[in-house]
């Protein structure tokens, strides 16, 4: 039994060798084009990524806007949690607060959103930045509708509420602007 020899190695034909190499490269995804038309030279460049390709070209003022938004959400949340009467009075000049619980729940929800805003400030991922900006725009849009409906019901109109509505609409416009700017395809260099 010790005298039995293994079968001789067979040589591959050049055509099947090329097909095999092509299949291997296709499985690994090396050499082909990705969705953006980039051709990867090696698997390492695919895994590590191309910095130019993955770098987000941030619009001017985006990080400042994110910081201001996070500060705004945090400060209003803290005010709603700690001083619900004063917040309600600032929005609806002189109206009586019937219950503090809804205002405090509003503050808790805003605090949760502000945590998302603070985390988005430190990320470079386009998707997270865009979702945060969309969340902001939706929040300010819904808040504008709610304040408008409340003013229509109560009939109380003051300079403070008009300024609040104008600022909320401005925030919606700025958030949507940055949302679309971050989502644009980068120009090929």
Curated annotation (Swiss-Prot):
Q: Where in the cell is it found?
A: Membrane
TM stretches of this protein: 64-84, 109-129, 131-151, 156-176
Keyword Lipoprotein recorded:
no
Q: Which residues lie on this side of the membrane: Cytoplasmic?
A: 1-63, 130, 177-189
Which ranges does the record list as Extracellular topological domains?
85-108, 152-155
Where are the Phosphoserine modifications? 14
Q: Per the annotation, which location comes first and is thus the protein's main one? A: membrane
Classification via InterPro entries: TP53I11 (IPR028266)
Task: Determine if Transmembrane helix is one of this entry's keywords.
Answer: yes
**Keywords, ordered alphabetically:** Membrane, Phosphoprotein, Transmembrane, Transmembrane helix
Give the way it sits in the membrane: Multi-pass membrane protein
Q: What is one term from the GO cellular component aspect held by the record?
A: membrane
Which protein, by its recorded name, is this? Tumor protein p53-inducible protein 11
Tell me which species this is from: Mus musculus
